[in-house]
Amino acid sequence: MNLDFSDDQKLLQEEAKKFLTKEDALKINRAVMDSDKTYDQDLWNKIVELGWTGIRIPEEYQGLGLSHLELCVIAEELGRQLAPVPFSSSVYLFTETLIEFGSEEQK
């Protein structure tokens, strides 16, 4: 049984790692901790532009239509870098709930 990531998943992981390292997510996290902000809006905007928030949204709704495994790949890199962004609440909780229980209009 192969429990390794696929080549595409490894590429996604590497690209996420490069992006977050380039953005210096750890430094941004320190700045957020020293402020009254709960997350970094600039980093979050860049993540949204990359399409990461649409990982689990089906392509028919302009998402990426990827699986939970790709979602975990991104989440792992965000956690590794301690990226101060609302990824969990936005993508795990809200998006998954909307996909599962939302009306067509909401989707």
Give the role of each language-model region.
Residues 21-107:
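Glycine-rich flavin
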Residues 8-18:
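A non-catalytic, amphipathic alpha-helix used as a structural packing/dimerization or gating element
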Residues 1-8:
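Intrinsic disorder at enzyme termini
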